[in-house]
Amino acid sequence: MSAFVSKYEDELIKTAKYIATPGRGILAADESTETIGKRFAGINVENTESNRQAYRELLFTSPGSYPCLSGVILFEETLYQKTSDGKPFVDLLMENGVIPGIKVDKGLVDLAGTNGETTTQGLDSLGARCQQYYEAGARFAKWRAFFKIGATEPSVLSIQEDARVLARYAIICQENGLVPIVEPEVLTGGSHDIKKCAAVTETVLAAVFKALNYHHVLLEGTLLKPNMVTPGSDSPKVAPELIAEYTVTALRRTVPPAIPGIVFLSGIQREEQATLNLNAMNKLDVLKPWTLTFSFGGALQQSAIKAWAGKPENVAKAQAKFLTRCKANKDATLGKYTGWASGDSAAFENLVVIGYRY
């Protein structure tokens, strides 16, 4: 089917293409107040607005990080915050060639008729909110759906419902000038092997792109944020080269070349692990018609937040840690990462957040 023709069509295509610039990626700094609170608890920092502002300012003002980043995903609170000297975060990012984006979903609700599966809420007010976010300076958005692997999961109902919701979100964003990042995440929890994850990922992605087509979404003005294909978290680990092979194969079977970029989520992967996997994908010698880059949260921030520990005197040290991960992932998007950033023990720390619920 033909894509919807929006008055923003040219801008959407230009923005999506820019975000997918080879050698650059996205910092996902859109943790909810509850989630950032759990990360702060791990470093004994109180979860206040001023501390959240200080931490985001640390990230956004890190010297040398801008050439590694094409976009930053913000939480709604952060979209309207300013630096300590009064400059809006949005202006700071744009002046340095980094496009601001915004998380627009409203979290998960249980999907009735399933075995504990979920769907994502927030469509009712989305159009009006997108207009407000565009006026505030955001130029792309993110919406996540979760798919768990179990004996009978993900169910057909879950796949079809979340694919429909992702497509509705995407077209509403495009009608209001925001590039949609479509994020169908197959969760890593479980003891399944990599082949099972690959099969589920392919099924989910096929359903998502079918729904995007039905809803006339402009693929050239859309970005995909999928999981990497890995074994379950309770299964034996495998080499980055195998993860790369299964992930790229799943994408080649399901993702149209009209999509300009695939920006991987890192999930609960350790910093170094996520970087090595991304690097292996970009080194893989097969046709990949899209840019393969990163949209990492914890896998860009773990070393930095630990070094910061809420203390102003640690800001420069934390920024140096953040820059190290930015440069490592920049190299990985080009298939040129050599492991030079693996010396920090925090790069290998478990990123599971106990009690986490999106």
UniProtKB/Swiss-Prot annotation:
The keyword DNA repair does not apply. It catalyses: beta-D-fructose 1,6-bisphosphate = D-glyceraldehyde 3-phosphate + dihydroxyacetone phosphate. GO terms for molecular function: fructose-bisphosphate aldolase activity. The active site is at residues 183, 225. It is found in: Cytoplasm, Cytosol. The modification N-acetylserine is found at residue 2. This is Fructose-bisphosphate aldolase 7, cytosolic. The lineage of its organism: Eukaryota, Viridiplantae, Streptophyta, Embryophyta, Tracheophyta. The gene is FBA7.
